[in-house]
Amino acid sequence: MGTDAYVLAGIVITPVALKYLRAKNFTGNPFFYAIYSKRLQTYCGLASYLRIKPQIGTIEVGWITYAPNLQRTVEATEAMYLMMKNAFEGLGYRRYEWKCDNLNKRSKKSALRLGFKYEGLFRQATIYKKRNRDTAWFSVIDKEWKKLKKSYQRFLKSSNFDKNYEQFKKL
């Protein structure tokens, strides 16, 4: 890593990557968010909305990149909750999507844990790193949001966590 790279709590962002992110945010698709930890007092991750299609009411969450100190924390879950809440309640979308490489077991597990429903597999959907990539599709739709939101709110209550931020009840 050169001296011109930015390190965000373990996430390396080079000037080229920063230029790319800035250019993408000016178009609004994808639209990136920085994830800040109040507990750690630092930025720990990135996530974005992409494939934003207001004309048909669909939006995807992706480019999710967490530093090790954000992974598997209540803050990581809360960040995903806030983005989902904004997609449905703030922006008025009817469908919220999550897609990932079918080989990415952690991403698929995260999608299911966060309340997304598995929809299927697009075989050879793209070419990635000189190989065919099968893409797993997940979604939450507006009719499911009210119930899912209640689950998130119960999970995120401070009474659900001990002093070390370990949860008592799962999402």
List each model region and its residues.
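GNAT-family acyltransferases
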Residues: M1-T73, N86, G90, R131-L171
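Glycine-rich acyl-CoA binding loop
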Residues: A76
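Flexible ATP-lid and adjacent glycine-rich G1/G2 motifs of the Bergerat
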Residues: M83
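Conserved GNAT acetyl-CoA-binding A-motif
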Residues: E89-K99
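Conserved beta-strand-loop-alpha-helix junction that forms the acyl-donor binding cleft
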Residues: W98-S107
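Hydrophobic residues within well-ordered alpha-helices
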Residues: S110-A111
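Conserved catalytic-core motifs of GNAT/GCN5-like acyltransferases
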Residues: K117-R131
